[in-house]
Design a protein with these regions (language model features):
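Short, ordered, surface-exposed loop/turn motifs in non-cytosolic proteins
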Residues: 17, 24-39
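Short strand-edge motifs at loop-to-beta-strand transitions and within beta-strands
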Residues: 53-57, 92
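Short, acidic Ser/Thr/Gly-rich low-complexity loop/linker segments typical of extracellular
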Residues: 40-54
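Beta-strand-rich domain onsets/edges
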Residues: 1-16, 22-25
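A short, solvent-exposed loop/turn motif at the edges and junctions
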Residues: 42, 65-85
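Short Pro-Gly-centered beta-turn/loop motif in secreted/extracellular proteins
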Residues: 56-67
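Short beta-strand edge segments in extracellular beta-sheet folds
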Residues: 82-91, 97-99
């Protein structure tokens, strides 16, 4: 289940996925690859976090069920696969918080 941030969405456009990837201690993680996969498990977007650990897609996803998977590794940190439903609404920023391995 996704953890939504209290931050305002970066856009009012529906079906735009954005958020932040953090370590368990709250530190942001720059340069991580995030994959957004459709219900068939096919990657439909690949993103890289910026210097602040933030990510965002620039074009909206088609309505449906998607998973967010951290595609690169971080020393001693693992991430759950997050499932989201996209349904023509503004999506609040999502926080992916790592767990100590």
């Amino acid at each position: 289940k996704p953890k939504f941030s209290k931050m305002e969405p970066i856009t009012n456009e529906p079906n735009i996925v954005s958020g932040m990837i953090k370590k368990s201690d709250g530190d942001s993680i720059p340069g991580l690859v995030l994959l957004i996969k459709n219900h068939k498990g096919e990657a439909v977007r690949a993103l890289k976090t910026n210097a602040l650990g933030q990510f965002s897609i620039s074009t909206p996803l088609v309505d449906g069920i998607y998973t967010l998977e951290v595609g690169s590794t971080v020393e001693d940190t693992t991430f759950d696969i997050i499932t989201i439903e996209v349904k023509g609404e503004v999506i609040p920023p999502i926080e992916l918080i790592g767990k100590e391995a």
